[in-house]
Amino acid sequence: MLFRSIDQDFRKNWFKKGTGNVRCLKTVDYYTIEENQNVPKDWVTRIPGINMLHVSELYIIAAEALLETNYAKALEYYNAETSSRGLPALKGDVKLTKDMIFNEYHKEMFGEGQVWYNMKRLNKDIISNLDSKTIPASEDIYVIPIPHDEFNYRD
C-alpha cells in the first residue's frame, strides 16, 4: 500500500480497511464557489466534480522538471507539496530522487486515472496490487496497436 509507513500523511484517510480488503473512500472532490462569482443562483456553494489539474500535481511536475537543472528549486517544490500533506520536509543527507517524485505523484493521483499515463511516460514496471506480481514495462503493455483498418483505408 502506498501509505503504509507514513502515519502523518493526510492521504491515509482516503482508505478504510474492510474485512480483508482496502477500499478507497476518495472518489469525488468538491469545489467551493466564492460568494461573488458570476454563477447561476440555483448552484449550491459546493459542487461535485473531477479535478482536471491539481495544484499539488503542478508542484510535483515542476519538481521533476527541475531536478537535474535546479535541485534547490526542485526540492522547494517537492517540500511544498509534501508539507501540505502533513509530511516533514526533506533535509540533511536525504537526497530527492526521481523515484521519490514518482512515488509522491502516485500517492497524490491515486484513483484519478492519471498514474498509468505517468508510468507509461517513464516506462515503469507495473506491480500488481492483487498478488504483488511485477509486469515488466514494454511496448506490449504501454503501446496500443494501430487497427489494421487504419492502414487499409488511410489513402
Residue ranges and their predicted role:
Residues 4-155:
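Acidic/polar-rich alpha-helix caps and helix-coil junctions
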Residues 1:
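His/Glu-based metal-binding/catalytic segments typifying zinc-dependent metallopeptidases
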